[in-house]
Amino acid sequence: DIDDTITKTSQLTGRNLLDNWYFVNPINQRGLDSYANSSGLYGIDRWKILSGLSNFCYVEVNDGYVAIVNANTTPGNYIYIAQYFEYEITPAGVSRTVSIMDKDGVVRSSTNSNGINWVYGDGIYIYQGDAKSLNIRLDAGKRLNMKAIKLELGSSQTIAHQDIAGNWMLNEIPDYGEQLARCQRYYQIFATQSVRPTNKDDFRPVMRTTPALSTITIGSTTYYTASAEL
């Protein structure tokens, strides 16, 4: 029956190698609804903008999805957004699958044993530059709206299944607190400067390395940050 099918599907769900992958309710410690940045800056947690096109790469946090936008319409001008890892997450020669549920609930996926290299759509590419990253490239004028993204080992996508009516249903909704803790290994924010540690081992959770300390302003309030981002 349907309940039995869902149970079996859940049992076979592979581990998502990505952090902050559920864009219906993303980890967004910097607190903005839209990020327009040039190369090397972060918007939502763990996703780094890689673009020389200052203020043409937008990451928008919308109601129920995140959009990546290349607002430059001149052919040949592309942008990247990437997630980096501390270690190699996809062993050489092992099949890996990337899958995306878009804003409309449609799921598409691609499998490769030599590093993800997927033409997701006209002018949109998802690939691994190496075993320690996942990159999304958008050509001029392109937009990608996502509810969720998954990178996993194996030759099948397990991000979602179809119900009896053919609708795609996510196989799991991640625990927000767990995802926040994973992101806080790389970035933490404090309302009070005096309670922000300086040694990585004094943070909770412990940070990846000794962080760079700074401030950000959200609305009219100053917050105190610690970044150990890659």
Where are these regions (language model features)?
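Short carbohydrate-recognition loop motifs
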Residues: 54-76
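Short, tryptophan-glycine- and acidic/Ser/Thr-enriched carbohydrate-recognition patches
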Residues: 25-52, 214
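Solenoid scaffold repeats with emphasis on beta-solenoid/beta-helix
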Residues: 42, 47-48, 59, 66, ...
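Extended extracellular/luminal ectodomain segments enriched in beta-structured repeat modules
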Residues: 86-98, 131
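Extracellular polysaccharide-targeting segments
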Residues: 1-31, 135-193, 226
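Extended, low-complexity, turn-rich repeat/linker tracts enriched in Gly/Pro/Ser/Thr and Asp/Glu
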Residues: 90-95, 103-107, 142
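Phosphate/adenylate-binding glycine loop and adjacent helical scaffold
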Residues: 73-78, 103-124, 130-132, 188-230
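Short surface loop/edge beta-strand patches of beta-sandwich-type extracellular domains
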Residues: 10-14, 77-88
